[in-house]
Each structure stands twice: as structure tokens, then as C-alpha cells.
Regions:
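Beta/alpha (TIM)-barrel catalytic core signal, keyed to glycine-rich beta->alpha loops juxtaposed to Asp/Glu
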Residues: 119-298, 302-311, 315-318, 326-331, ...
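N-terminal binding-site loop/beta-alpha segment at the start of enzyme catalytic domains
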Residues: 1-78, 122, 137, 143
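Local cysteine-cluster metal-coordination motifs and their immediate loop/turn environment
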Residues: 295-310, 345-361
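Active-site mouth loops of central-metabolism enzymes
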Residues: 20-34, 83-93, 122-127, 221-232
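Conserved, mostly hydrophobic/aromatic
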Residues: 6, 16, 36, 43, ...
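Short Fe-S-cluster ligation motifs
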Residues: 325-353, 377
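Active-site groove signature of glycoside hydrolases
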Residues: 104-126
Length: 377
């Protein structure tokens, strides 16, 4: 395992993200605990010492699973991260209540790393509003040893992140960004990394494989990979890209099965950043594919808890993208037709509640209307 220095610590270069644990019957809220425990144990015994969870992951069950299975190991033998769920504005006045409950769920007296979760356009004003006292409370917990390192994650624009840094930057020790070779330009990740480098803030990476989208390659992108590094796996290219980005300390991957976990750990046995024209060649070919592709959903499921109709939004977006990419066909209409009528895109009421929490800023209501018109249901 490659290790990175962070202050006085040595962190595994790869961390286990606990947002996409194995689940039962496709239900995101029902974690397959036996499979998850096996993954946690394998990660722990094969060099991973950083585990990342959050209040809302797996409908609130990720922290419970983290606590149940990590607590079997000495507390000083691993690093645990969680986050304050400010992506939901109704939580802003509940920081103490939520923090105390998180400690209970995770069966720990402290968090090694704690984050303001998802700083973006929809919550920046609330995060910075002194009436909630969020920063003051978290700094007090740090003073009391219940938070060892304080940081933030962000899906917002460069301008929003700069506002956050202007207000709280001197207290931030790390920043978690959506970073991969697809988003280097598409989501302005390059500019965000430069902002962190300038501020001297280490970068934590989320979505290194873009929700699994970068685990496969085709066309010119695949040909380029095969020509440049024929021995490297497609997911390996995503991690080698990140090993090339200045300021990256931690790469978090939300792995869903043992096969993914073992493969990624194997990749992180070595540090092999891209060289020569590999970096730009990879990005250029991905940019071209992105221009041809559909909506950039990562299936994070933030949207589903904010849909009053209970629509399976990530699944519908995936089918929409498939329908667009193939220029029609029968697969999407067949799949949607097999769904209960109340789960189809035509049932979207256009409230845009989902759009308020979408990290990718997808215009979901417009997609639903477009999809409905295309397939007639």
C-alpha cells in the first residue's frame, strides 16, 4: 500500500468510501452486513487505514455499519471520517444533536476527520450564517479532542468554494473534491485543485471512477490506454491519473464488492503517475467522449430522499442516457414499462426538490419531461 504523509500521520493512499457498500435486494438502505464486514476486514488487513462514512449514506445505516465492524479493532489503528449533513438545510440548527448521534452510531469517542458535507450553491449562505454557529461548535469539539482534523467537501463552483475559504479557510485542514479525468475540465476540477494548492490545503478525492463510469473504456479512449500502458487496467488509469495530480493526499473509492476492493488495493501497491503526454492524452480523449455522452449522474442517491413521488431518479437518468446514446431503441422503453406506473418519469411533478441537492447540478425535472416525451410514459 502506498502511504501519504498528512501532518504527523501516514494515511493509506486509498481509503474505503462507505457510500456504496453491498446491499440486499437493490435497496440502498439495507446494507449486506456480512459482505460489508468482509470488505472492511480485507481493507483493514491489506493496508487501508482510512474509512469514510457520512450521516446520510445508505439511508443513515453506513455509520452504523462502520461503527459495528471497525470497533472490533484498536481505535488508534485506523482513521475514521464522517460529515455534518449541511446539504439538508433542515439540519443547520441541529449540529450538536447530529454530532453526538454520529459518535454513538460509529461507536467512537472521536472522529479523526470531520467535514462540512457538500459545500455548494444551495447551502453556502446557511453554512456561513453565524446564527447556526456550526463552525464554532465544531472548533469546540476539536479543542476537546472529539475531532482531530477539520475539513470540508464541496461540489459547488469555484466561486462558492472561494467564498467558503474566505470565511473559514484558516480552520480547514483538507478539502474533499470530486476529481477524476472526466471532471478535470467538465466539473472544473482543475481549477478547484489549483485553488486548494494555492491555499496550501491537501486534496481528498471522491468519485475517482465517476460512480463506476470510468471502470470501462471504449473507442479512442480504450485504444489510447492500450497503446500507452497495455499492462494497466482501465480503473487503474483513473488512479494513476490521480497519483499525478499535485496536492492529492487521499483517494476515496466507494467500492461495492470484494473484486473491486482487491483490484484497487493491488493498484495502490505502487505509485506510478502518468508521464509524458499520458495525462493530456487521457483528458483530451475523455473530454471528447463526454461531449458525446449524456447527463453526468453518479448515482449518489442524494436526490431520491427529496423526491415526494419516490421516483428512482438515478435509474431513470441512466435509462435516459442509454436512450439518448443509442438514438432510441427498445431497452429504455422496455425497462420503464416494467416499472410500476407511479415510478415512471411521467409522475415527476416538477417540484425541483431533487435539483436542490444534486451535486452534479443536473436539471432533473427537464430530463423527466424530455424522457416522458421520448418514450410516452
Amino acid at each position: 500500500m502506498v502511504y501519504r504523509e498528512f501532518q504527523e500521520l501516514k494515511l493509506s493512499g486509498l481509503g474505503l468510501g462507505m457510500m456504496r457498500l453491498p446491499v440486499l435486494d437493490g435497496d440502498d438502505g439495507r446494507v449486506d452486513e456480512a459482505a460489508a464486514a468482509e470488505m472492511i476486514d480485507y481493507a483493514y488487513h491489506n493496508g487501508i487505514n482510512y474509512f469514510d462514512t457520512a450521516w446520510g449514506y445508505h439511508d443513515g445505516n453506513s455509520e452504523l455499519v462502520a461503527g459495528k465492524y471497525l470497533s472490533r479493532y484498536p481505535r488508534d489503528s485506523y482513521y475514521l471520517a464522517s460529515k455534518f449533513p449541511g446539504y439538508d438545510l433542515s439540519n443547520m440548527d441541529k449540529v450538536e444533536e447530529i454530532f453526538e448521534r454520529q459518535l454513538e452510531k460509529c461507536r467512537t469517542p472521536y472522529f479523526d476527520f470531520y467535514l462540512f458535507h457538500n459545500v455548494y450553491e444551495g447551502n453556502i449562505d446557511a453554512y456561513l450564517d453565524p446564527q447556526y454557529g456550526i463552525l464554532e461548535y465544531l472548533l469546540k469539539q476539536k479543542e476537546n479532542g472529539r475531532i482531530r482534523h477539520l475539513g470540508f467537501s464541496a461540489h459547488g463552483s469555484v466561486e462558492v468554494i472561494q467564498r467558503f475559504l474566505d470565511a473559514y479557510g484558516k480552520h480547514m485542514e483538507f478539502c474533499q473534491l470530486q476529481l477524476n479525468y472526466m471532471d478535470w475540465h467538465f466539473q472544473n476540477a482543475q481549477e478547484k485543485v489549483a485553488l486548494m494548492n494555492k491555499a496550501g490545503i491537501p486534496v481528498w478525492v471522491m468519485e475517482p471512477l465517476r460512480g463506476g463510469k470510468l471502470a470501462q473504456a471504449s473507442g479512442e479512449l480504450a485504444a489510447f490506454m492500450q497503446s500507452a500502458r497495455p499492462e494497466e487496467t482501465v480503473p487503474g488509469w483513473a488512479f494513476r491519473f490521480l497519483q499525478s495530480v499535485p496536492g492529492v493526499t487521499m483517494v476515496l473509492s466507494g467500492m461495492s464488492n470484494m473484486e473491486q476492493l482487491k483490484a484497487n488495493i493491488a493498484t495502490y501497491e505502487t505509485d506510478e503517475p502518468l508521464v509524458g503526454d499520458e495525462f493530456e492524452g487521457l483528458v483530451e480523449r475523455m473530454d471528447e467522449e463526454t461531449r458525446k455522452a449524456g447527463l453526468p449522474c453518479t448515482a449518489c442517491h442524494y436526490c431520491t430522499s427529496h423526491c415526494p413521488k419516490g421516483l428512482p431518479i438515478p435509474e431513470l437518468i441512466s435509462l435516459y442516457n442509454e436512450h439518448k446514446a443509442t438514438g432510441g431503441g427498445f431497452i429504455a422503453p422496455m425497462a420503464v414499462g416494467s416499472m410500476p406506473e407511479e415510478k415512471r418519469p411521467a409522475n415527476c411533478i416538477g417540484c425541483r426538490g431533487c435539483e436542490q441537492v444534486c451535486p452534479q447540478q443536473i436539471k432533473i425535472s427537464e430530463m423527466m419531461a424530455d424522457f416522458t416525451s421520448m418514450i410516452g410514459m
